[in-house]
Amino acid sequence: MTAGSVAAPQIIPIRIPPPGKAKHEIDSSTPVEIKSESPDVRVLYTLDGSKPELTKRPGFADSTLKYTEPVRLPVGKVYVKAMAISIDGRQSAVVTKVFVVEPSASDERELNAHDEDDSVKNDTAIDGKDVVENGTGVSSVKYLDISSNEAHRALKGPRFLSQRLGPGSSARLTAQNSQNQSADVVESPLKNLTNTQISRIQRETDFLRCPKCLSHRPSDPFARFCLHCGAPVPPIPGQRLPPTEGGQMGLCMHCKTMVPLNTAICVVCESPLDQQLQPQATLRLQDKFICHSCGTGNPAHITHCVTCESQLLRQARPVLSGQRAAPVPSSQGKMVSCSKCNRVNHSDARFCDWCGAKPGHKASSVKCSQCGASSHPYANHCGGCGVFLDGPPRMPLQVNQRQDAEEMQQTASAAELATAPPSVGLRMCADAQTQTVGLFFPSNTELKKRSQQREAELSRQEQMRDRKPLLTAISPGRGFWRKQLDHICAHLRSYTQNNTEFRALIGEPRLGRMISAVIQEDSYEVSLRINFISAPPEESRSSSAGQRSRSVTSESQNLSSVTEGRNSASPENNINTTGSEVKKKKKKKIGTSDVTENQPESKDSLLLKEVGPEGRGRIPAVQQLLDEGADPACLGKDGRPALVAAVLNGHHDVIPVLVQREADVNQASGPLKNTALHEAAALGDEGLKSVEILLGCNASIRKQNDRGQTPYDIAVAAGSSSVLSLMAAHLGQGLLLRHTKARSLSGLDTFS
């Protein structure tokens, strides 16, 4: 036996082994002891061969007994099964032992005495007298005269019941035992049945419950299926039809005579009428379809007539999916609120679709759409055909109200049409609306699933995100440039957070693209200088290149005046320094001045150079300079903008780029205050392409310079016929559009 297990009980008969008999052969007076070697256990046993059970199963007899003292077995072949159970619920193995119990000599004497008492009682009952013992009357019962050899193995009554009821009940028990013995003799075929067989017989003979789910039988006597599980229920014994009405007549199937149906037999041929009145649910006439062309009857399973082969017209019927019945459409659109959650449901709803509670109003019966039978309002299956009853579909309140209004409108229109004579060829139609998209409410499971997916996505993003570099005292060097940059950024951030003056200075300027970086290294320090383009503020984008260079110089002075650990350094404070330190500072100052002198040109100057006579007017280069902060309206040394310089130098491809970047196409410049179109017209045929592009960019032809000349006047003076025709065409098109717009406005005023 393993550790912690409960020892199986032992079944031992308490007797001296008689010679010539086996161990399992005992008599009815031999006590049988059941014990287990494990302490603090209780023993359960059965005498009908079934397994001992700790809890009683519903629908089965309680045959499990608790062992308290040695028991005596009844006469016959007895199967004793025992099991030990500990306090904490651990169970032992089930032990089975079979005994062949024979009646003892004392039992035979008691049985003979009871037989004599039975004969006396029978005589008394025949004479019509009552047997009175200890003042108690026992009603007369008719007993059968059974020979002693058939009743010598009858079971006796309870042995220990007299001790519990007291000494005064011995006479009553004697009379009851005699009655029970006589009844046992009559019901002898059920004596040797096991508990399982008795339960099966009880289940088969219990007509008030369903044999599958043990639910109550439908109250309708003609219901053939269970309302809860849909299983077929056995018919009630002696089922009868409801009583016929007075004067109801029917046709007798034997003599073909109309006879009254309220009689048991036919008054003519005396054949029974009960069998003829039984409903024949299994018999069904074959469906037929009549052909509209030739009038031939056709079977229901074909689609074309067997005679003329024309297509048969079938009647529309509800589509039923297998063993499910569609809900019957309700004509009432009333809604009822739930008493628990205040959810608005249909008036014919059996349960609330939110909380599942039953409605507080009185529910009517449920009607099956397949066979038309009425069932219990909370039935799951039809009692007539056994199909599953689907619930009514959920429809919004607005749709119901709209349908009610449409029905009322259709009713009113139908009444009007009924009074008026129908016109020939008028087709009656009505508009119908339906809802195709409904509201969606996610369930609790779907909400949990979404939150879990969101958390998993966040954790995955956290794992993929680059970790911030740790702030260390010394960088690795040796070519690890990524770690070097991380070291520089981390120390620069830490220094900026701890130094308020440097933090204020670094937060002021608007930095552009980094243009250069210089590193100087000696045995003591590593100097790093980084130069950025100073982006001008929004209000001063048209500043000159000289102002930009001065801002860059001032910014470099501000940044160089603040160094790590030397914020207030001056020549007076460094008098006592060593020679090496003075030499190092001189070297650093010399390097700084060289860098300042070798600063690159500004973006505006590079833009003017690109559109100037030395430049090539490349569109990508101009776009890059504009993206890096160059001003499209910047002025050159002669006071002319970049747009005019592009026209004069023949770079007409960059004109749309400058105009798109907010360059003024009508900006006047130069000594005569000419615009870009003036300069293009003065070039003659060489500036034809520039004139065409400027006119496409909405350059003004009526703009005058200081001499009062327009671009058209300058083109006339230059003698370029192509430029004149182009300007005339553009001017005429503008006048035509302006005149057309004026006419359209006047026409609208006239008709208004």
Curated annotation (Swiss-Prot):
Gene knockout outcome: Morpholino knockdown of the protein results in small eyes and severe pericardial edema at 4 dpf. In addition, dzank1 morphants show impaired ambulatory activity. Morphants display dysmorphic photoreceptor outer segment (OS). Retrograde melanosome transport is severely impaired in dzank1 morphants.
Assigned GO CC terms: cell projection; centrosome; cytoplasm
Segments of skewed composition (Basic and acidic residues): 448-469, 600-614
Recorded GO MF terms: zinc ion binding
Main location, first listed in the record: cytoplasm
Low complexity compositional bias, start-end: 536-554
Compositional bias (Polar residues): 555-580
Cited Gene3D superfamilies: 4.10.1060.50, Ankyrin repeat-containing domain (1.25.40.20)
GO BP: any one term: eye photoreceptor cell development
SMART domains given in the database record: ANK (SM00248)
Zn finger (DZANK-type) start-end: 210-270, 338-386
Subcellular location: Cytoplasm, Cytoskeleton, Microtubule organizing center, Centrosome; Cytoplasm, Cytoskeleton, Cilium basal body
Positions annotated as ANK repeat: 638-667, 672-703, 707-737
Domain of life: Eukaryota
Region (Disordered): 448-471, 536-614
Keywords: ANK repeat, Cell projection, Cytoplasm, Cytoskeleton, Metal-binding, Phosphoprotein, Repeat, Zinc, Zinc-finger
Function: Required for the intracellular transport of organelles and vesicles, and is essential for the photoreceptor's outer segments formation, maintenance and function.
Name of the protein: Double zinc ribbon and ankyrin repeat-containing protein 1
Gene name tied to this protein: dzank1
